Amino acid sequence: MAIVKCKPTSPGRRHVVKVVTPELHKGKPFAGLLEEKRKTGGRNNNGRITTRHIGGGHKQHYRLIDFKRNKDGIPAKIERLEYDPNRSANIALVLYADGERRYILAPKNLKAGDPIVSGVDAPIKAGNALPMRNIPVGTTVHAVEMKPGKGAQIARSAGASVQILAREGAYVTLRLRSGEVRKVLAECRATVGEVGNAEHMLRQLGKAGANRWRGIRPTVRGMAMNPVDHPHGGGEGRNKGIQPVSPWGTPAKGYRTRSNKRTDKYIVRRRNK
């Protein structure tokens, strides 16, 4: 995997920095693990915009990823690594000894042909998935469940990881990349190692059109709008007149919006600002 800065042969190429990935599969994805993915344009069933800045973009199939890793005790090997347009991480096609194939998030340093396994007795090795009560304190993991059997929810993007800080009773304490320290049930599963493709953050798209290919539409500043459209709109010259807020008036900087008090007891330390 290498970082390549394109030559300025045109205005659209001048600022492009891309990640070259010769290890990824060049052909089509495995058809048995694809699903139709329909575009919404950011609209709900009433036709109203519920998520701004979404629309257009290239057609994509959704890849069914195995976030549960519940095929215990059956050895498997990485058949190939693939690009996934639906996430920043790459994915790996896994072939199990019984002939079944599944997609998983591609861990760092894993390559085609490497063996992996899931289950309580799995060795502590990158790519293996097991309950966190069986993983030593201090280990770096990813694809962490928040409820046993629900499937991975934490540390799934490119380069993401979580460190196990302690184990006490029915819970383990995790340090997340955000700086938050929280408790999760020790029966929850995690995959050993980090998510691969950490170089994803170094790429530069180089032009607005590259975002349009991805289905991302332009973001207009509130100060450039009229008063009817945004709290920052209108006025003479460039003047907000108020503290920075969202289009709906919620303070945009430093304001706490977390409302799930039921799970506050599991957060040992809030994330770093």
From Swiss-Prot:
Comp. bias (Basic and acidic residues): 229-239
Any single GO CC term annotated in Swiss-Prot or TrEMBL for this entry: large ribosomal subunit
Gene Ontology BP terms: cytoplasmic translation
The UniProt record lists the keyword DNA-binding: no
Stretches for region Disordered: 222-273
GO molecular function list: rRNA binding; structural constituent of ribosome; transferase activity
The keyword Kinase is annotated on this UniProt entry: no
Disulfide topology: none
Key words of the record: Ribonucleoprotein, Ribosomal protein, RNA-binding, rRNA-binding
InterPro entries named in the record: NA-bd_OB-fold, Rib_uL2_dom2, Ribosomal_uL2, Ribosomal_uL2_bac/org-type, Ribosomal_uL2_C, Ribosomal_uL2_dom3, Ribosomal_uL2_RNA-bd_dom, Translation_prot_SH3-like_sf
Pfam name, any one: Ribosomal_L2_C
Function: One of the primary rRNA binding proteins. Required for association of the 30S and 50S subunits to form the 70S ribosome, for tRNA binding and peptide bond formation. It has been suggested to have peptidyltransferase activity; this is somewhat controversial. Makes several contacts with the 16S rRNA in the 70S ribosome.
Family according to the record: Belongs to the universal ribosomal protein uL2 family.
Subunit structure comment from the entry: Part of the 50S ribosomal subunit. Forms a bridge to the 30S subunit in the 70S ribosome.
Protein name as annotated: Large ribosomal subunit protein uL2
